[in-house]
Amino acid sequence: MSNMEHDRWSRVKGRLRSSVGEDVYSSWFARMDLEAVQQESVHLSVPTRFLKSWIQTHYSEKVLTCWQAEMPEVCRIDLTVRSPMRAAVTKEAPAPAEHRRDEHRPAADARSHAAAPAPSNHDALGGSPLDPRLTFASFVVGRSNTLAHAAAKQVAEGRRGDPVMFNPLYIHSGVGLGKTHLLQAVTWAGNSGTERKVLYLTAEKFMYGFVASLKTQTSLAFKEALRGIDVLVIDDLQFLQGKTTQAEFCHTLNALIDAGRQVVVAADRPPADLESLDERVRSRLAGGLVVEMAPLGEELRLGILKSRVVAARTHHASFDVPQSVLEYLARAITHNGRDLEGAINRLLAHSKLNAQPVTLEMAEHEVRDLIRPQEPKRIKIEDIQRVVARQYNVSRSDLLSSRRTANVVRPRQVAMYLAKTLTLRSLPEIGRRFGGRDHTTVLHAVRKIEGLVSKDVTLSDEVESLKRQLQE
């Protein structure tokens, strides 16, 4: 790049920074490079496909305008994903100096230097505690968690330098369905060798570490240590709070993914439903592999119970639970895996303390408070949009579009009404999920349908039919 092109590129970046603001610039444009300038086009590059897609979708006109202020003849911006190898070569350029220093050391000293372990940044960060029981060996696989288990296993078995297949890996489910088990299994497996540095943090631990680094003026060391991790595992992301902390998490996420490092995240809902998180973070998370762990089926619950009995026998060899009792527990305790484990612990305690064998009568008495009423099905806005679109013979994209024809407006209003009555989503969130509409539009739709169903029998029947379909 010539000096003239370098100066011009610096001015364009300055215009872009002023136009979009420092936060947006840092998140999306800080890693954009100038590759070439031709007569009517400019060739730019970014390190990931996600950045390319996001910039092209949201900022292509703005980038072009900033260039045209410098070069009016430019009519096209070409944005490509640069090779990871190029970035690696650039970052490793200072290495020869280190090699030259080693060449002048005595042989014994050089061998000592080569054998020394790498600085343990992940130890210095103080990861969250790990439960030694939560490994892949103790994880019970069933229909509801097969994909999540396979993806987590793929991450855990990766080696430094391998291409990353899906990044970030985002696992979500309700409480007690195995998210933390999988994340800790990834960490145990990843740290079993010395090749990779794998760090497991809860969102609260991440927040605590970042805030503490600000107070002690060690935030730079905190950031550098985090970004030296090969695999970063973050649990309970729904608890990540604070604008500054979220911005730092977003920067860390971008830095690790752009460097080809793996990120694994778990939360209790999909990325789009994390309303407290900045949109940039939600978008970045949604750009990887998003996997839902569904509620445990009866067959899987039975498998979990059997595995817990086997685990209990390692310390209590005579402990036994009849098959009929296990089948009863699998049918009766449907809430989550923690309740299943709690049931086995209660039976073990009662059996040992009272020197009595486990019976069905004992089990019914001991676990009675773990048998909860069946919870209503959790309905998603995407499900509502899909069912409504099918009912009214329109497409889901029609519901999200700006079309105002009668055959689209009424289904859209019905879908918004159902989203408000069947989910816990706020009006602004519902509006955002319907093509970025304002909350007042949603409120108008809800009131409109509420008024009509009390007078229009046909519409009332349609709405009730849709509710039944969604709740089945």
Curated annotation (Swiss-Prot):
Stretches with biased composition (Low complexity): 113-124
Region named Disordered: 89-127
Biased composition (Basic and acidic residues): 97-112
Sequence segments annotated as region (Domain II): 73-128
Entries under SMART domains matching the protein: AAA, Bac_DnaA_C
Gene3D superfamilies the record matches: 1.10.1750.10, 1.10.8.60, 3.30.300.180, P-loop containing nucleotide triphosphate hydrolases (3.40.50.300)
Molecular function GO terms recorded: ATP binding; ATP hydrolysis activity; DNA replication origin binding; lipid binding
GO CC list: cytoplasm; plasma membrane
Organism superkingdom: Bacteria
Biological function: Plays an essential role in the initiation and regulation of chromosomal replication. ATP-DnaA binds to the origin of replication (oriC) to initiate formation of the DNA replication initiation complex once per cell cycle. Binds the DnaA box (a 9 base pair repeat at the origin) and separates the double-stranded (ds)DNA. Forms a right-handed helical filament on oriC DNA; dsDNA binds to the exterior of the filament while single-stranded (ss)DNA is stabiized in the filament's interior.
Family named by the database record: Belongs to the DnaA family.
Name the record gives this protein: Chromosomal replication initiator protein DnaA
Organism the protein comes from: Rhodopseudomonas palustris (strain BisB5)
Lineage summary: Bacteria, Pseudomonadati, Pseudomonadota, Alphaproteobacteria, Hyphomicrobiales
